[in-house]
Structures are given as structure tokens and as C-alpha cells.
Amino acid sequence: MTLEKARALVAAGVFCLAAALGGGARADQVYQGCAQPGPAGKVWYLDPVNGKTPAAGGNGSQTAPWNSLTGVLSFKFPPGYTRPLLSSVPYFHVVDGKRVYVADQLGSPPVQPGDTIMLMSGNYGDIVIGDYLQQVVNPSFVTVEAARGQTPVFLTLYIRSTTKWVFKGIKVQSLFGTNNSKLPLVTVTDQGAALPSSNIILENMQVSSADDTDGWTQPEWLARARVVGISAKGTDHGANTTCVSVTNSHISKVIFGAEVMANNMLFSGNEIDRFGDDGIDYVASNILIAKNYIHDDQVLGNGAHMDGMQGYPGASSNVVIDSNRVIRQADPKLPFPTYLQGIDAFDGDWTNVTVTNNVVVTSACWGILYASVHGGKVINNTVVADGLMPQPGNCTPGVVIKDKTHQGSSSSDVIIRNNIANGLSIYNLDPNMTMDHNICLTIKGKCVILTYVGGKPKWGVFKPGEYADHNIIERNGAAGMFVSFNPATFVYDLRLRPGALAIGAGNSAEAPPVDITGAPRAGRVDVGAYQHAPLK
């Protein structure tokens, strides 16, 4: 997908929602060009508490539900099931006197691709889709969904080498080591180019190590919490797991929130909180990370480098990060608060990266930072220090483009524009590097704008005033800019207050057409993530 198309999707507030799918079909949020579920097939019911096996009279109806999801989806079907009830699942059986491991219609399996499986409340155990060196190929989407008013629970969900699944409204929860499993709570992966995965939709998932971690000590956190909430990770730098979408889900009480490491991936509308390392780790091509809320990270004593979103080593292209909020601490009762870098990539090599409309409130040196970025746009973000945790050298979160990472080449063709931050820096010795129409928000009367002259950093720009390319160091700090900014009570309303210097001070070139709320940027463009509107 081109960068322009990605931004257009963000501007519209939708992500390839099907406009007319036909009778019975619904629109799901997926990355542009990925498959959508078609018309719905039959609906089946499972109940792990009151259901029965087929042998005992269960027929999958609402009045006689089956009792095992494993019996429907897995080659390891339990007693009372003579084969997987879903026809696309390979399994061992005898055909024409020979033992084979294939998917077929032998025995008239009732569940077909295109059908929906409704789950009643109860514990379904560890759910595994796919097998070693085998692939489950669905020509149409199979939907596994919580029935209305029900809370089905999986211990883990492991999806590999398969196609076309929707999981919706499922709670996935277990402690680290449950059933000897150290896997992420939810995994989507492949087994190489010959056994890929594609078109996996996860919607409205509730993913956590436990409901309540209050009272856990830091060692107990490290011993009990799952290492990763949701992991979508393809081999060959994301190429063999594609078209994964994770939307409107809640990931909580884990060490790492999510891994966005599959090509053509959408990660949108999710909340990640109470985590002990990074909120989102990402490295892939054609990914859209939008409208997520990441907050309340915790220090657990394991030496973690804390990041809201961190880019990983590898070559990535066509990355859009738009309209996210990264708030270091929103809960006054958070047990182990700590610093949190915002949105960054210290490693890897990045081509066509757009970072727009994001809000970062933190105690850290880096609010938004990239290096080895080529064709980058960091536009209309708001990055401010909460001032609650002193940092080495009294650094404050800024918007920064550096020269290069450990693995990548020097940055080129990058724009820093229309941002509000407590510091601004660009390695302008690289070709086609632009920094204009930004506002440097003072703390105690100072804010540093760092550029390079003759190969050396120019440190002397920190006093209020207007500098080159309409970059402004303002005088009044956060109190003069935002509707409400009160770190003492963890209240951060970063809309622009009437009369704020940022109103109308932006550059319309390359600015996103809507702000973080979806409001249009019509006429004069404001600086920061929010376009000003009269308060109601």
C-alpha cells in the first residue's frame, strides 16, 4: 500500500471496511487489500459446561451444543469425536486401505469454511489451530465468536500455517507456565514460505495474565505474568504471515503487550496497560498502527528498556503510526511506575514512515525518535513531559530524527512539521531533512532546538523566540497551551486552549487531513495532534 493510501484510510477513520458484502455478511477492519469475510454460513454452538460430544447426542444446535472446541478445530480430537468436525482440518485416518493425513469430507463433517461457531461461557483450554508441517486452508472465513452475553475463556490461542479465521469476543487468560506453556497468550505465525498464514482477524479480544494483579510483588510479576499478550510474527521479516488484524481489544497485565511483526497488518483501537516492558514492538512492511491507547507501564526489576512502541531490527517499509496515545501513567495507584520512551526505532532501517496525530505524555528522553529513516514524515504530534520522574541530565521528551541506527544507513528525506514537544532535533547534515513550523514547549523557560552546522551540534538555541523555518520556542509552557495539564492529578487534556500559540501556526503541506479525534483540519492548520475547536 502506498503511503498516500494509508493516510487516506486513516483520514476516513476506517480501514478497508466493506461497503457492500451481500446478505448476511459483516464488515471487519482489515488492512487494505486483505480479504473480508463473505456471506455467513451455518451457525453452530459449543458449551464446555453443558454440551455433549457427538457420540453422546450433541449436534451443535443451540439446544444440543457440542462440548469441545478442540473437537471441532483440531486433529487431536477428544473421545466422543470420530474426526475434526471442521472439514478443512487435516487428520490421520484410513482411506482405501492407506493411512493418510489430509482434510476431506469423509464422514460428512458438519462444520464447513464460512460457518460461525458460537461459544457459551466456560473454559475451553489451550486452543491450537494448525499442526507441525501441515496447513489448514479455509477457502472462506471460519468465525469463532462469543455468543451474546457469554464469556468464553481460552488459556492460550495458537494459530499457525492457516488461512481465514475470525476470533471475536474471546477472553484469553492464563499465568505463565500454565500447562507447561511459556507461549504468548495469543500467537499468529507460520512455518516458512511453504506453510504461510494469512487473513487472521482478532476482534474485541480480552487478553491478560490474570484479572487482578494487585498485591503482586515485582518477583511475582516476573514469575507469573505472560511474556507477550498478542504476537503476530511472520518468518522472513514478516513476509510469511500476512493480513493479520487486531482491533478493539484489551491487552493487560503482561510483560510485552503486542508484537506487530507481520506484513500487511492492522493494529487499531486497542488498549494496552499494566505491562512490564514494551507496549508494542514492531518490524514489518505495510503496517498500520492507529488509535491505540497505551498506558501505565511498570518497572519489574528485570532491566527492561521501557518503550510505548519500539521498532525492531530489520528492514521495514510503508509504516503508518497515527492517532495513538502513549501515557506513561494514568492510574494514581499504579504499583511500580517508571519512565517510558514514547514511539521510537533505535534499530533497523525504515522506508516510508508516517508518524502523525500521536500524543505522548511521559518522563523520558525520547518522545518520538527515529534513525535510519528514508522518506519519513513526523507531523502534527504532541509530546510533553509529565515531570514526575527525574531523567538523566534533566532530559525531556522531544521529537528527534537521528542519523543512523546500528544496522541502517543514514536518514534521508525526512520532515518534522507541526509538532508540539519539549525538545526538537534533526540531523540535518543528511540529504533533504526539513524541520519547520514546530513549537518547542518550555520547561522553566527553556526548550532546546538542536540542528547541526559544519558537522557539529548547535546547542545554543533554547531561549523563547522564533527561529529558522518558523520553529518557535514559546514562553508559557504546557499551562498556556492546553485545556488542562495537571500531572499531579494525572489529568491530560491536550486540546488547544483558546488563544494558544499553536492555533493556526502550522504548515498545511503534508499535514494529515484530520486530527487525532477525526476532526477535519480545514483552513488554517494548527500545530499538534488536536485541531482547535471552540469548547462546548
Please provide the spans of the model-predicted regions.
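Right-handed parallel beta-helix/beta-solenoid
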Residues: 27-99, 123, 481-484, 488
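Surface beta-loop-beta hairpin patches that serve as ligand-binding interfaces in beta-rich domains
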Residues: 28-37, 68, 83-112, 456-458, ...
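Extracellular beta-strand/beta-solenoid scaffold signature
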Residues: 129-132, 153-157, 179-193, 215-241, ...
